[in-house]
Design a protein with these regions (language model features):
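Alpha-helix capping and helix-loop boundary segments enriched in small/acidic/polar residues
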Residues: 105, 110-113, 157-164, 168, ...
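Generic, well-ordered alpha-helical scaffold segments in large soluble proteins
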Residues: 42, 63-70, 92, 96, ...
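A helix-coil-helix interface module used to build multimeric assemblies
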Residues: 1-203, 208-214, 221, 277-278, ...
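Conserved helix-loop functional segments at active or binding sites
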Residues: 146, 183-186, 190, 219-226, ...
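A general structural motif at alpha-helix termini
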Residues: 60-64, 217, 273-275, 389-396
């Protein structure tokens, strides 16, 4: 059985070990590639300050590239008796290279090592989320343009209110994603700062070159203060979780709208048949299960910031084992959100729109405001026009003109989709993912 990195002469209690390790071995598989990348940057820096020879660095880099390839192919495993990904990588290096493998931990603690792994993992996941959001955004904008002239009822208080359009409906969710991406960009900028070299949270007596590892890993800058670098554990995850939650909130609302509008009582849209399921007893049913699950999963993601906040709440400065539990709720959340984005993008691309909703007389009253405004344009005071139309409705004399003339920015006749698309492009361009990608390719020699 592999020896623990911290093991001394005290016998390990197996029940205590099971309790303290928890799900770390499972969760750390998310971090394997990133742990290897961090080690490659760290040992390159160690060689530059004389703690490794050039030949030792060459051996270690070759071995780490092999381990990275295993992780990339999903073949990396954390063996029984090994606590975490850091221990497994060091064990593999030591088996292959002997004492040289034992040198990689100089000037480093598992505290800053896991901080680094989490940041490398998170920024890579943010890139994938951003790309998925952008794909959904483009589908929504295309559908908004396609159906810009198709009117639908607008609602307030779940009561029919005023004319809207499918152009507005699709476009509203597109613009919501722009704001969501601003949160994601802010989270990325906080995440893209290098904690490596903070060690256990108080630095090291080795002359570490933290600027060098920052450059090698493609970070924007450092977490300069070593105490704050450690204090940032939990805070970084919470801030990223807020960004994920804002995206999830948009998807949840869209899923609810689609389920509602797909129901027979509304009949505004038709979801793709392959995204519905049947009933075991009612042969006519086509249930919108994909969007119902999307709504539930997204609501779960919206609880993530509170979960993380409560786990890390009231901790003083320094490292505490409480923080380990955050990984269990944080790491899987990215895949869940990506799944929801993928499903929503597919459905929004395939959704069918009822182009004749307003032929139904039940929606005639949504044009009452249009009539009030027409009278006001002809010179009648607005309040008098409002009263006249109200009395006509009560007396059953109201006959609507089912035409709308909305021309101001963001209205039915002037969706401003080009401006919304420009806003999204501006946000996307502000991420600057190319820095981290170039750095990682350089480390791997690709």
């Amino acid at each position: 059985m592999a020896q623990k990195l911290w093991e001394k002469s005290v016998q390990v209690n197996k029940d205590i070990e099971r309790f303290t390790v928890g799900r770390d071995r499972e969760m750390d598989l998310y971090l394997a590639k990133h742990d290897v990348l961090g080690s490659m940057a760290h040992i390159t820096m160690l060689e530059s300050i004389g703690l490794l020879t050039a030949d030792e660095l060459k051996q270690l880099l070759a071995a780490l590239k092999d381990i990275y390839a295993q992780a990339e192919k999903g073949e990396f495993v954390i063996e029984d008796g090994v606590e975490d990904v850091h221990s497994q990588v060091e064990l593999m290096l030591t088996r292959r290279l002997g004492d040289v493998g034992k040198k990689i931990h100089s000037g480093r603690s598992r505290n800053d090592q896991v901080l680094l792994d989490l940041k490398l993992f998170t920024r890579a996941q943010i890139k994938e989320i951003a790309e998925a959001v952008e794909q959904l955004f483009h589908v929504l904008i295309c559908q908004s343009e396609r159906y810009k002239d198709v009117l639908m009822p607008g609602y307030t208080h779940l009561q029919i209110a005023m004319p809207s359009s499918f152009g507005l409906w699709f476009g509203a969710y597109a613009e919501s994603l722009v704001d969501d991406m601003l949160f994601l960009q802010a989270a990325f900028k906080m995440c893209n700062r290098n904690p490596l070299g903070s060690a256990a949270g108080y630095g090291s007596s080795f002359p570490l070159n933290r600027t060098m590892t920052t450059r090698l890993l493609g970070f924007d800058s450092l977490n300069y203060n070593v105490v704050y670098a450690q204090m940032g554990r939990g805070k970084m995850e919470r801030n990223v979780a807020f960004a994920l939650a804002t995206i999830a909130g948009t998807l949840s609302k869209l899923a609810y709208d689609a389920c509602l509008f797909n129901s027979q009582n509304f009949g505004f849209v038709k979801l793709p048949d392959d995204c519905t399921t049947g009933s075991s007893i009612m042969p006519h049913k086509k249930n919108p299960d994909v969007f119902e699950l999307t709504r539930a999963k997204c609501n779960k993601i919206q609880s993530l910031p509170q979960q993380i906040m409560m786990i890390a709440n009231n901790l003083p400065s320094g490292y505490f084992r409480d923080l380990q539990i955050i990984k269990e709720v944080f790491l899987p959340a990215f895949d869940e959100l990506k799944d929801c984005l993928q499903m929503t993008t597919y459905i929004m691309n395939e959704i069918k729109v009822n182009e004749h909703i307003l032929d139904d007389d039940r929606y005639s009253l949504i044009f009452s405001v249009e009539e009030v405004n027409r009278l006001a344009r002809e010179g009648m005071p607005f309040r008098d026009a409002y009263k006249k139309v109200g009395l006509d409705i009560e007396a059953g004399r109201f006959t609507p003109c089912k035409e709308v003339h909305h021309t101001h920015e963001g209205s039915i006749g002037n969706l401003c989709n080009d401006a919304i698309s420009a806003l999204m492009q501006q946000v996307v361009d502000g991420f600057h993912f190319e820095g981290m990608e170039q750095a990682e390719r350089a480390l791997l020699g690709r």
